[in-house]
Amino acid sequence: MTKEQLNKARHQLGLTQAAMAAKMGIGTRKWERWEGGHSPISAEGATLLRLLVELNKQESGL
């Protein structure tokens, strides 16, 4: 996932970077590095993020 995709996903969920990190079960700094493009998101992290976005869409009725 690109940093733009990570940023878009976080905004779709309506979360701050700290809240997104907490929801993902990681530290804020790690999320900031992923979203800033300084380190790649793990495969597990990308899968969890996709699931969170999909769940949010379903709960929102989209």
Where are these regions (language model features)?
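A short, Lys/Arg-rich alpha-helix, primarily the initiator
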Residues: M1-H11
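Short alpha-helical DNA-recognition segment
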Residues: G14-R33
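Residue-level detector of intrinsically disordered, flexible termini
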Residues: K8, Q17-A18, E59
